[in-house]
Amino acid sequence: GLGDVYKRQPKEWLDALTPLGTDENKKFIENAPYLIAIFEKKFSVSKNKKIKNYYVKESVGIATGILITCLHFSGLAMLTHTPSPMTFLNKILKRPSNEKPFVLLIVGRPDKDVKVPKFAKQKKKFEEITSIF
C-alpha cells in the first residue's frame, strides 16, 4: 500500500513534504469522481516491428499541461499524483509493457472543507524563475 511507499522514502524527501501536510493517507483519491491515468508510449509495434517514438516525455508533458488547463477552465480542480512505483497502473488498467505511467490526475470539485496549505500558495516571483536574454 501507500504506507509502504512512504516507509521506503529518504528522510529528506519526507521532510520536504511536511509543510504540505501530506502523508500516506490519500482519501482524495478515493473521493474523486475522476482519475485520469496518463501513460507515455516509448515505442509502437506494427507488423511485429518495434517503432521508436521520439520526444515522448516532451509530447506527453505538453499534452498533460493542455489537459490540466482545460480542466481548470472547465471549473474542475485537479492535482497530480505520482506514486512510486507506478507500474501497478499497467496491471490494473491492462496497459501493454511499451506504455509507462507518466502521471495520475485526480480530478473533481474540491471538498467543501478543503484547506490548501499556506505553503502551497507561496509562489516564486516571475523574476525568480525567468531569465530574459
Give residue spans per PLM region.
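Short acidic (Asp/Glu) patches
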Residues: 11-23, 49
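C-terminal helix-cap and adjacent tail motif
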Residues: 103-133
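Short, surface-exposed beta-edge/turn micro-motifs
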Residues: 32-35, 101-102
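Extracellular/periplasmic catalytic domains that process cell-envelope and extracellular macromolecules
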Residues: 27-31
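Short beta-strand segments
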Residues: 37-39, 106
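Small-aliphatic-rich amphipathic alpha-helix that forms the alpha element of a beta-alpha
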Residues: 36, 44-45, 49-92
